[in-house]
Amino acid sequence: MTSSSSNRQFLHRTANTFLTYPQCPEHPEIISQRIWDLVGRWNPLYIICAQEAHEDGNMHLHALIQTDKQVRTTDSRFFDIDGFHPNIQSAMSPNKVRDYILKEPLALFERGTFVPRKKTFLGNSSKGNSEKKPSKDEIMQDIISHATSKPEYLSMVRKSFPYDWATKLQYFEYSANKLFPDIQEEFINPHPTSEPDLLCNESIKDWLQPNIYQQADNGSRKQSLYIVGPTRTGKSTWARSLGRHNYWQNNVDWSSYNEDAIYNIVDDIPFKYCPCWKQLVGCQKEFVVNPKYGKKKKVQMKSKPTIILANSDEDWMKEMTPGQLEYFEANCMIYIMSPGEKWYSPPQLPPTEEV
């Protein structure tokens, strides 16, 4: 999966804007004039821009632009200049931002008169200055509004809340995944498809159509499939060839669960070692699981079938109580393999020539 920039809306709304242009060799005066023109409609009051040598050896530019009215934009590329894209933040404490910019400048440009304001979203300097320190909620809201990717979001959190980042990183990673969900890559099936060589292939086809091939969510629950039979008959390869799936062998690991999968496969796991077997077999929706080394989470937002594969010596049905077996039979199509059956077609022999 690749990281998404998300379809959530970027929002920048402040009278104090802090910009960082990484790997930008332009002179501060040139960038300052361009920024001044960009915010012209909001009546710019002051700008300071400094060139800094970053630890990676590249030149970075830091700029603080103050306006009489709040700059308002939902375009994350609004401050792009000649292909250089900046990190955009509200300057919660303009005094501190200005001090930071003046720390070790290699080149510097200023224009206008600095307005010492510390509270974001003030605007209109005629109403006086405020020394109120921004709250955590205000800082976090600003980060959420300005971040355009998962790495940028986590980087901004790390800079603003270093202690929280170090001690509660898993929570910030969770929120980052919610704000910027991964884009599901196109599924390329690595498992070859084949026609099963079964005595009753029609029953399998009848199960496949509504449970695997028809993906329209009409609210109905799917039906699972249970296959029990000898080893080396192609059960696993056939089951894995049907499409995107969650695959579990030896144990069920919910930490790797993929919500975009069409179906689940439980392969060669004894009945007593399969947690949530009822939810899986019953194709239930929205149930809570407890991944090992992780926190509880809700999975399966829609009904998904599960294909259970078992060898004859690990037949689930032999381990069930009468009540469990009744539930199993009501929610599963059961296919018990006959001798000679395989889940792949025998190779076609070339025709022999008559002598």
From Swiss-Prot:
| Sequence motif: RCR-3, positions | 100-103
Main localization is host cell
Q: InterPro entries given for it?
A: CRESS_DNA_REP (IPR049912), Gemini_AL1_MSV (IPR001146), Gemini_AL1_REP (IPR001191), Gemini_AL1_REP_central (IPR022692), P-loop_NTPase (IPR027417)
Q: GO MF annotations for this entry?
A: ATP binding; DNA binding; endodeoxyribonuclease activity, producing 5'-phosphomonoesters; helicase activity; metal ion binding; nucleotidyltransferase activity; structural molecule activity
Any GO BP: DNA replication
Positions occupied by motif RCR-1: 18-21
Q: Where does ATP bind?
A: G229, P230, T231, R232, T233, G234, K235, S236
Q: Where is this region: Transactivation?
A: 252-270
Query: What EC number(s) does the entry state?
Result: 2.7.7.-, 3.1.21.-
* Segments forming domain CRESS-DNA virus Rep endonuclease: 11-114
Localization of this protein = Host nucleus
List of catalytic residues: Y100
Q: How is the cofactor bound?
A: Divalent metal cations, possibly Mg(2+) or Mn(2+).
Summarize where a divalent metal cation binds, as residue positions. E52, H60, H62, E104
User: Nuclear localization signal: where is this motif?
Assistant: 292-303
Q: Which cofactors?
A: Mg(2+); Mn(2+)
Q: Which GO terms describe its cellular component?
A: host cell nucleus
Q: Where is this motif: RCR-2?
A: 60-62
Q: Which UniProt keywords apply?
A: ATP-binding, Covalent protein-DNA linkage, DNA replication, DNA-binding, Endonuclease, Helicase, Host nucleus, Hydrolase, Metal-binding, Multifunctional enzyme, Nuclease, Nucleotide-binding, Nucleotidyltransferase, Repressor, Transferase
What residue spans carry the region label Oligomerization? Answer: 175-187
- What does the subunit section of this Swiss-Prot or TrEMBL entry state? Homooligomer. Rep binds to repeated DNA motifs (iterons). Forms the O-complex, which is a Rep-DNA complex involved in the initiation of RCR. Part of the C- and V-complexes which are RepA-Rep-DNA complexes involved in the c-sense and v-sense transcription.
Q: What family, per the record? A: Belongs to the geminiviridae Rep protein family.
UniProt remark on domains? There are 3 rolling circle replication (RCR) motifs. RCR-2 is probably involved in metal coordination. RCR-3 is required for phosphodiester bond cleavage for initiation of RCR.
Q: Could you tell me what this protein does?
A: Essential for the replication of viral ssDNA. The closed circular ssDNA genome is first converted to a superhelical dsDNA. Rep binds a specific region at the genome origin of replication. It introduces an endonucleolytic nick within the conserved sequence 5'-TAATATTAC-3' in the intergenic region of the genome present in all geminiviruses, thereby initiating the rolling circle replication (RCR). Following cleavage, binds covalently to the 5'-phosphate of DNA as a tyrosyl ester. The cleavage gives rise to a free 3'-OH that serves as a primer for the cellular DNA polymerase.
Protein name (Swiss-Prot/TrEMBL)? Replication-associated protein
Q: Name the source organism.
A: Maize streak virus genotype D (isolate Raw)
- Print the organism lineage: Viruses, Monodnaviria, Shotokuvirae, Cressdnaviricota, Repensiviricetes
